[in-house]
């Protein structure tokens, strides 16, 4: 799934926070309440949303559910939102280039959904909170203001790590590296056989890589300091070590990486893994479905590993991507929107989503996972692996500052030689400091 397409960022101004609506809602001529759902059509496909909406409509004949699906959702809904025409529910990953969810968070233009957690799931006897896996709410991904209020409901969760071909490793007799020293030794071995150590679909996919590496190098507190723009955090030895490890890894990247790291060609970087031209790439469970029809080397078998540890026996982190559902403050049917969001956690809805490998963070779902992706989720059972959920804290908007872009996208310039690691570190420190000041 192209979570980070290279598209022009949509300028969503602070005026959005002023375009608030009432929960009375729109009604059709026949008296039906209109509920507008906008969902991003990513690697999981579109059919699951159509099926879930149809199932909801069957139980709510008094609601006219209008579903909008798009691979460029921000481009389509943002102009209407700036004109005061809001969808009632949006299902859209955070961390995308257009940064729509993040902009609305900064502008305080999202509806508080804390009460949804205590709603009874439509058609069932239990609450949403009781169905959700422990720890999946209450982090910066769901509670962006670092308080007890939830604004973004966790929709799908997926482990992300270094995806590789288990069959190739078995064929070559290679071991998955446990430390970075082992990783670079393997890189030299693979290079001698004409195989690159590393690639990425687009630079945006390095989010899961960096978050895990930051925690690995500096520990939980250092990771939190980076995410909350602690004073001088990018000047620390730990920060420099993160950038040095990354720069060395990028020196082993496939030569085609940067050229294909865009919205049109990103699957070609993914294909290099299936063709045994590259060993590792950062990705998530959705890649299995996204590349299901792609040709592959004989004996290919999907597998995932956490990042290598800095030292032998060190803790290893698995960045967990949580995609979100949210309600704009300007939505016209907030009550109906919250009911629909609660329905998304029903056994009926979760079953439909799971068939497309869109796994929701509800208790007991691991037992129902398709065999092809079950090993990815089994990584959570490894006692040496820690799940990492969250991301950069929200602040007031700062013109010209995009710390995710500075951290992730600069990888392209490191590979091409257009920037140095010193320039990278300086730019990150400058961006972090500006966001620290904005967060005061």
Feature map (PLM): residue ranges:
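Conserved N-terminal structural module of periplasmic/extracytoplasmic solute-binding proteins
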Residues: 4-107, 124-126, 176, 296, ...
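Short helix-initiation/N-cap motifs at beta->coil->alpha
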Residues: 69-76, 180-185, 259-274
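Extracytoplasmic/periplasmic solute-binding protein
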Residues: 141-155, 160, 184-232, 269, ...
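Glycine-centered hinge/linker elements that transmit conformational signals in sensory
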Residues: 190, 228-261
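C-terminal capping/gating helix-and-loop segments adjacent to ligand/active sites or protein-protein/ligand interfaces
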Residues: 359-364, 377-436
